[in-house]
């Protein structure tokens, strides 16, 4: 809102002296020449644009603002594209600037200016580097050692046989088989 107001005031201030001069030429008063010239100097001296520029220096007329130029090599876009500068950037987004020759043809009386174009240089931390492959070795299937498989506990039943020979068996003739005692033992195998 304020910028459009100051733009309107600036345009009015620039055109006001021409309008006043045109009206004075059309009127052609029959007064003294010295008084008329003194009156015109007063009008030109106190134009509002000078008051606005002295009062608000940040809104001064700057027709040659420095704007970064991004070159676009497009046959349908003969003019450079002006980039709006960003206010806040992270360190990863800060780009390097490189001086390149201007691709826009200059007129024969002007020197060829140089423009600035951005070229990103990514950091190594953002790049994925593939591992080197040896051509001499045969391919070994890779086993994923990081993946964890949930182990299921399977109970197993084993028969443990204890042979117990009693003292009576030693005194007798060994004709019968020794007594066999079986116990159920459960163990967890992972």
From Swiss-Prot:
Keyword line: Glycoprotein, Milk protein, Phosphoprotein, Secreted, Signal
GO biological process: one example: lactation
Site (Cleavage) residue list: 126-127
Glycosylation site list: 152, 154, 157, 163, 186
Principal place of residence: secreted
Residues in the signal sequence: 1-21
Record flagged with keyword Oxidoreductase: no
Domain of life: Eukaryota
Expression by tissue: Mammary gland specific. Secreted in milk.
Cellular-component GO terms for this entry: extracellular space
Residues carrying Phosphoserine: 187
Location within or outside the cell: Secreted
Family, as annotated: Belongs to the kappa-casein family.
Function text: Kappa-casein stabilizes micelle formation, preventing casein precipitation in milk.
Protein name: Kappa-casein
Native source species: Cervus nippon (Sika deer)
């Amino acid at each position: 809102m304020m910028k459009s107001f100051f733009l309107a005031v600036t345009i009015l201030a620039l055109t006001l002296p021409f309008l006043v001069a045109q009206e004075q030429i059309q009127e052609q008063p029959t007064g003294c020449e010295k008084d008329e010239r003194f009156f015109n100097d007063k009008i030109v001296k106190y134009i509002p644009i000078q008051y606005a520029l002295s009062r608000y220096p940040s809104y001064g007329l700057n027709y040659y603002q420095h704007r970064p130029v991004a070159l676009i090599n497009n046959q349908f876009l003969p003019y450079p594209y002006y980039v709006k500068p960003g206010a806040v950037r992270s360190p990863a987004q800060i780009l390097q600037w490189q001086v390149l020759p201007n691709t826009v043809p200059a007129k024969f009386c002007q020197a060829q200016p140089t423009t600035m174009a951005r070229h990103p240089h990514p950091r190594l931390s953002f790049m994925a580097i593939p591992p080197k492959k040896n051509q001499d070795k045969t391919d070994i299937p890779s086993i994923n050692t990081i993946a964890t498989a949930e182990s299921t506990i399977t109970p197993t039943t084993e028969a443990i046989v204890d042979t117990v020979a009693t003292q009576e068996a030693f005194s007798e003739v060994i004709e019968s088989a020794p007594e066999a005692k079986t116990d159920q033992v459960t163990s967890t195998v992972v």
